[in-house]
Amino acid sequence: MTDIFEVPSPDNNLLDKAEQLRLASIKTSQTNNNERIRALNLMADSLEKNSKEIIDSNFEDYKKAEIKGISKALLSRLKLSKEKLNLGIEGIRKVGDLSDPLGQIQIKKELSKGLILERKTVPIGVLGVIFESRPDAVMQISSLAIRAGNGVMLKGGSEANFTNQAIVSALKKGLQKSNIDDNAICLLTSRKDSMAMLNLEKFINLIIPRGSNELVKFIQENTGIPVLGHADGICHLYIDDEVNLDIALKVALDSKIQYPAACNAIETLLIHKSIAPAFLKKAIPIFNSNNVKLIGDKKAVKLGVAFEANYEDWQTEYLDLILSIKIVDDLEEGIAHIQKFSSKHTDGIITENISNANKFMSEIDSAGVFHNCSTRFADGFRYGFGAEVGISTQTLPPRGPVGLEGLVTYKYFLRGEGHSVDDFSSGKSIYTHKDL
């Protein structure tokens, strides 16, 4: 068995799959907008037609995972209900409704008479996506890849093998009815292959890891392929002193309990000292009734929080019904805490003071900064991107939920009429550098 810290060389079977995928991605890049939209609709149709097989496969995966005793957070992500499947299918169709990301002219400039420069969006090529547990990610990633004219190599967690294979089989059946080569989607099922993927520099143009902190950091450190991703989702919500308590409670609850295993769920709640007694008096019974374990600093414990926090709690991504609570003296202390412990994913403030909100949103350097709304909105589907291939917490773009715009690059096209640099050096021709 291959250890997670071993990166083997790809064997001939994997190299053959990678070459087929590379060739299919080239063909996909040459398809037009209508062909790619039609392919997505056929993929969605096929998922609907094969939904029973997919749900049954997920049931088998879930049973095995329960027996193995995997964490509640992973079990929650693994579960693919009929509702989740339908949302994934809807997401594929919505991706088809989005504007064509390819061939968009970003720059058009006359360099000289008859010498025209354009910068246009083009596919990245082949995406390598490694993810844990969430089988619905297969639908999101595959649809975005095809819409942007890319091929994709997928490796999900072994706990979702049956589900992932059923979904990819359905997607390929859909592609077989389209003008897109079904080899544009490739699923790997062994850990050895997923690690060997890191050595496929000649075939893969971008790796997108979606999983644990350990997995993402390992991939970032062990491949020469560019990596897009985030290693942690330590999100914060700060409740200011000028606040509507009902709004604060509603948003705090949604940010934590709506789906605690999500990377955009809050792990730490910061509360201004003047509002903390009134807020916690209302909040603690509701959190308790929703089975949320509350861990707080000494001030929070004095106000009724059951367990005392230690330093590690402020830098822990629980992905579970556990919430750290800290009482702060003012907005500045809240901002300082977030600046120290945030993973730069999503952080929010609840306040009626616009000046305080603006200060918070300006000084917090996260991919998403929210005012008076749940951190759970940090999602490509909710942003109207159709779906997301992942979330990036890096400062350079793409940043935040990555949809279609993060799966294209650009290329410079220069058309002339026999122009030579020597003509400009000699003064025979001149640059006009005129925007068109």
Swiss-Prot record:
The keyword Cytoplasm applies. It holds the Pfam family Aldedh. Transmembrane segments: none annotated. Its EC number is 1.2.1.41. InterPro entries: Ald_DH/histidinol_DH, Ald_DH_C, Ald_DH_N, Aldehyde_DH_dom, Glu-5-SA_DH, GPR_dom. It is found in: Cytoplasm. CDD domains: ALDH_F18-19_ProA-GPR. GO terms for molecular function: glutamate-5-semialdehyde dehydrogenase activity; NADP binding. One of its GO terms (cellular component) is cytoplasm. One of its GO terms (biological process) is L-proline biosynthetic process. The keyword NADP applies. Keywords: Amino-acid biosynthesis, Cytoplasm, NADP, Oxidoreductase, Proline biosynthesis. It catalyses: L-glutamate 5-semialdehyde + phosphate + NADP(+) = L-glutamyl 5-phosphate + NADPH + H(+). Pathway: Amino-acid biosynthesis; L-proline biosynthesis; L-glutamate 5-semialdehyde from L-glutamate: step 2/2. Belongs to the gamma-glutamyl phosphate reductase family. Catalyzes the NADPH-dependent reduction of L-glutamate 5-phosphate into L-glutamate 5-semialdehyde and phosphate. The product spontaneously undergoes cyclization to form 1-pyrroline-5-carboxylate. NCBIfam families: PRK00197.1, proA. This is Gamma-glutamyl phosphate reductase. It comes from Prochlorococcus marinus (strain MIT 9515).
